[in-house]
């Protein structure tokens, strides 16, 4: 079977109820595919069993750019609602530090202090028109479809039911919109010192490749929020 080639693609996520959880509103396609790669090739890492010798090169089916970046965009969508919801995080009463917070008179362990204290956490829930998130990429269509089939949701707190995907559509297009789009503007964080022009976007430390939470991947970037 001949190898598939990298082509410009439009990727559409159809959400079940149109809601997903994200603080800054940025959802990156390469981050989704990165997570899917580990589901397929290294599930033990997601289970907390990290063995460096079992992790080789993480090869996503995307064009590989300089600085180990991938040719993939953020999601674009029409936001129609935005609310703050809260979730409660239970304390771990069996944590080693809990005896330090035992009230000897009452015989009660405080759940509001300590490393594993209880939390009431806010999260920003966004609702998008028609439940559609659109991404752009340059990569191998069949391989991307294969990885996306493993991803049931996008954004944070999918276990709570946010960002659940009903289906993924991947289609070939003519142009590469992974960096800029004529309608939507900048399509991913771009390093300030490597940008070929000035952008009217906030400048902040932001990751340029997945995993986006990892400090080592952060650079001073133009970030297309809002």
Regions found by a protein language model. Name each.
Residues 1-226:
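RNA-interacting cores
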């Amino acid at each position: 079977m001949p190898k598939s080639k990298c082509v410009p693609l439009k990727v559409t996520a159809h959400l079940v109820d149109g809601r997903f959880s994200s603080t800054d509103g940025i959802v990156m396609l390469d981050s989704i595919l990165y997570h899917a790669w580990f589901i397929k090739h290294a599930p033990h890492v997601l289970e907390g069993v990290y063995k460096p010798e079992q992790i080789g090169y993480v090869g996503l089916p995307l064009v590989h750019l300089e600085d180990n970046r991938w040719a993939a965009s953020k999601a674009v969508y029409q936001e129609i609602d935005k609310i703050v919801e809260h979730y409660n995080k239970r304390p771990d009463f069996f944590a080693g530090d809990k005896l330090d917070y035992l009230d000897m008179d009452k015989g009660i362990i405080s759940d509001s202090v300590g490393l594993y204290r209880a939390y009431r956490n806010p999260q920003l829930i966004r609702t998008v028109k028609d439940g559609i998130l659109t991404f752009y990429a340059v990569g191998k269509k069949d391989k991307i479809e294969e990885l996306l089939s493993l991803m049931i949701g996008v954004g944070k707190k999918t276990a709570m039911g946010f960002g659940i995907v009903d289906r993924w559509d991947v289609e070939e297009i003519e142009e590469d919109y992974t960096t800029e789009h004529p309608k939507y503007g900048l399509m991913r964080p771009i390093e300030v010192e490597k940008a070929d022009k000035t952008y009217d976007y906030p400048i902040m430390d932001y990751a340029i490749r997945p995993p986006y939470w990892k400090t080592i991947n952060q650079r001073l970037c133009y970030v297309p929020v809002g």
